[in-house]
Every structure is written in C-alpha cells, then in structure tokens.
Design a protein with these regions (language model features):
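N-terminal pre-catalytic segment of deacetylase/amide-hydrolase enzymes
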Residues: 1-18
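Structural preference for beta-strand elements that scaffold enzyme active sites
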Residues: 16-18, 43-47, 64-70, 132-136, ...
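A short alpha/beta connector and helix-capping loop motif
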Residues: 28-53
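Active-site beta-loop-alpha junctions enriched in small/polar residues
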Residues: 22-24, 49-53, 70-74, 138-140, ...
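Catalytic domains of cell-wall/extracellular-matrix polysaccharide-remodeling enzymes
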Residues: 111, 119-188, 193-205, 209
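C-terminal domain-boundary segment and adjacent tail
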Residues: 163-166, 232-275
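Acidic (Asp/Glu)-rich catalytic clusters
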Residues: 7-9, 34-40, 55-66, 83-93, ...
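Active-site gating loops and adjacent loop-to-helix segments of metal-dependent hydrolytic enzymes
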Residues: 78-106, 234-237
C-alpha cells in the first residue's frame, strides 16, 4: 500500500507531523493563543469548539485556516460553562450546561440528540465560513463508546473528513476496534496522537526523536496569559506553557533535525477525498 508520504510526493519513510492547536473558541485567550501558535509557532492546524463562548469570535479571524471541529458534549469546568446548540435535554446537567464528565454523557445522553447536536456543530462551523478539515472529540467522550463513535464516524464519512482517534492502548480500554472501523470506511487517521491534559513541554524533545514513518499528531492547547484565563481554569499555566513551547524556535529546529515534514489536516482530507 502506498504511504501517505509517498502520496504527498515524499520518501515513504518520511515522518509526517501535524501540530494542532486545540481549544479554539474556548476562550478569548485560547483564540489568541491558537492564532499565535499558527502564525508565529509550529502549529499547522486548530480545533474549534463550536458551542464554546468564543467560537463565533474565532470565525472572523480564522476562516481560511486549517480548522477542524472538536465535537463537544462536555463542559468540564465548575464555573465556566457552555451547552448544546440544539434542543438536547439529555445533554444538560443540573446547571443548564453540558455534563462535566464523559461518564455522565455515556449514562444519560440520548443518541439521537447526540447525533443532531454533533451534525449541527459541523454545519454551524461551515455556516460561519470555516473550511472544516477534520473531526475530533473534546475529552474523547464520543470516541470511547461504540454507539457514540458511530455518530462521529458517520459524520466523517458524510463530510469526507479525517478524524483524530486516541492511540496508545485506548482501543483495549474502550473494548472495540475504533481505529480499524474508521479505516474500513476510508477515513484517514493519524498513526500516533500525542496529547496531554498538562503541558507538553517536557515531552516534546522525546516525541520528536521517537518519530517514525507515518503521521504523528501533536496536540497542544495554547493560550495567552490573562486574568480571565486564570479565573476560568486551574490548568491555565499549562496552556500558557504550551503556547511558549510551540512558539520556541528550538521546537522547529528539533523537527528539522529529525527529518520530519510538517503537514496540516487539509492534506489528509484531500488525500481521503481523492481515494
């Protein structure tokens, strides 16, 4: 089988790297962080949380960028909340926002309401002018149960979009072969996904020098340091550190020394649609 690198005109063994700035729309600080990560740093794509409070503002600045939709059915913070953009009572908790945990969604969400909500999030991003390049799932909630995964896979097929799927043993813990199911439907997925709920700074050098053939996605959550960010989230320092790390020229030099070639999700999408 021809490798992705070969289909892009590169040697078969070339490590391909996507650096995705997740959390676009999550907050104003995240919008500016994603913008800087793509313009001044090594990020080649971003992920948009359509229901989040600053998503609409992001559309005015990022319409032409390589932006995917982070399908969102959770609002995990205690004080900073958002909710469905459709009528979806089963996707509300007692505070009137999305449930805080994946387990709450898995236990109580009506699958038809989830299907309508997720499709509406993609359609709204398109309505706002985004050329949607990929799908992912906030907190991976929709990827780790088969009935919810089917919703995302259906969207990926319908819209011709590649998708992020967890790696590193996640299939074993989920109990079903979600990666094979996606590939069987012709959906492109990265071979390795590197992400963390804390700063990736300490891992980046190791990750780069362990790159192998295929597509590796490095997921960061960049944000600028503001008083509002500090009030919104207990992990604000990790987000600021992600921005600093990805904008550090040393990271670009690491990729170059490792022989890696940076791509965006749009490249995977176009290959998928031509298949």
């Amino acid at each position: 089988m021809t490798s992705v690198a070969e289909r892009l005109g590169l040697p078969a063994a070339t490590p391909l790297v996507i650096v995705t700035a997740d959390g676009l729309g999550w907050a104003h600080a995240a919008n500016i962080g994603a913008e800087r990560a793509m313009s001044d740093g090594a990020a080649s794509a971003a992920g948009l949380m359509v229901p989040a409070p600053w998503a609409r503002a992001a559309s005015a600045r990022h319409r032409g960028a390589d932006v995917g939709v982070m399908l969102t059915v959770n609002a995990e913070h205690d004080l900073y909340r958002w909710g469905p953009i459709t009528h979806a009572p089963s996707l509300l908790d007692g505070d009137g926002g999305f449930p805080r945990t994946a387990e709450d969604v898995w236990d109580h969400a009506d699958i038809d309401e989830v299907r309508r909500e997720c499709r509406a999030q993609v359609e709204r991003a398109i309505l706002w002018g985004f050329d949607v390049t990929h799908l992912s799932a906030h907190l991976d909630t929709l990827m780790l149960r088969p009935e919810f995964f089917d919703v995302v896979l259906e969207l990926a097929v319908d819209y011709g979009l590649p998708m992020r799927l967890p790696t590193g043993g996640s299939e074993d813990s989920a109990g079903f072969p979600f990666r094979r199911l996606a590939l069987d439907e012709g959906v492109s997925i990265p071979d390795v996904v590197v992400s963390s709920r804390t700063s990736l700074r300490g891992q980046l050098e190791r990750v780069v020098f362990e790159l192998g053939p295929g597509v590796t996605e490095i997921v960061v959550r960049p944000a600028i340091d503001t008083a509002e960010l500090r009030a919104q989230s207990t992990d604000w320092a990790d987000r600021v550190d992600d921005l600093d790390s990805i904008c550090d020229p040393q990271f670009a030099r690491l990729l170059e020394r490792a022989g890696a070639h940076q791509i965006g999700w749009r490249a995977l999408r176009e290959l998928q649609r031509r298949s």
